[in-house]
Design a protein with these regions (language model features):
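Transmembrane alpha-helical segments of polytopic membrane transport and secretion proteins
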Residues: 1-19
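Short helix-to-coil transition segments within interhelical loops
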Residues: 145-151, 155-175
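Transmembrane alpha-helices
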Residues: 127, 131, 164-196
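Hydrophobic alpha-helical elements at and bordering transmembrane segments
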Residues: 49, 56-60, 64, 94-101, ...
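Glycine-rich helix-loop "coupling/hinge" segments at transmembrane-helix boundaries
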Residues: 116, 145, 192-214
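Periplasmic/extracellular loop-to-transmembrane helix junction in inner-membrane transport proteins
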Residues: 3, 31-72
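Transmembrane-helix boundary motif in ABC transporter permease subunits
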Residues: 69-99, 116
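Generic hydrophobic transmembrane alpha-helix motif, especially the helices
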Residues: 100-136, 143-144
Length: 214
């Protein structure tokens, strides 16, 4: 009963914070403190959402498709990279610095180059999403593999287990927690990456919609 009351109280605080935020937002916009073209009021946002709902869904479908494809490829590439870096020290030393370098370049700087090289279709968007999502996946999985219990690994080796068996029964299960934490980060990255690339060139998508209605 006490725990249930705590959950209700916690949710009430969250709802109250959202209500206060919306109220302040409405006041700032209605009073003209912030111009409406910079910060439309919540009511204007709801009205625009209802009015443009079919068009929004059409553009959202494109953005979500790009996000899904890019995230899927990012997870696959990140998984393969993590496995190779875990198994081969030479690959780790050669590939890890390149991974870090790709993450130091701002996304907004990479996107125009990808659009220039690949055109205005889906390819540059998916490529950008892969670039921004595979790194968290690869690092999360690699840390998970390396956090596997050493005693268990040594025991399996003593019993004659090969690398694949050790990976499937010890390393992979121990990496799942970090994998899902990294996946949660990558999901947010994939949507942001898709919208940014659509801003800079494209025919459909939420980024294109935002540019047109600005």
């Amino acid at each position: 009963m006490k725990r249930k009351l705590q959950n209700i109280t916690s949710k009430a605080y969250s709802v109250a914070a959202i209500v206060v935020l919306l109220f302040v937002w409405q006041i700032l916009s209605s009073a003209g403190i912030v111009p409406s073209f910079l910060l439309p009021s919540p009511l204007e946002v709801v009205q625009a959402f209802v009015k443009d709902f079919p068009l929004l869904m059409e553009h959202a479908k494109v953005t979500l498709t790009e996000g899904f494809l890019g995230l899927t490829l990012g997870v696959v590439i990140g998984f393969v990279a993590a496995v190779l870096m875990d198994h081969f020290q030479g690959f780790y030393k050669a590939f890890y610095p390149i991974m870090v370098i790709t993450q130091t370049i701002p996304t907004i700087a990479i996107a125009p180059l990808l659009v220039l090289w690949m055109g205005y279709e889906m390819a540059p968007k998916v490529t950008l999403i892969v670039i921004v999502t595979f790194f968290p996946i690869a690092i999360g999985l690699l840390e998970g593999f390396q956090s596997a219990d050493k005693d268990t690994v040594n025991l399996l080796k003593a019993m004659g287990a090969n690398r694949l068996q050790i990976f499937l029964h010890v390393k992979f299960p121990s990496s799942l927690g970090r994998f899902f934490a990294s996946l949660r980060i990558s999901v947010s990255y994939c949507v942001v990456g898709a919208v940014i690339s659509e801003w800079l060139g494209g025919y459909n998508g939420l980024g294109v919609y935002m540019t047109r209605v600005r």
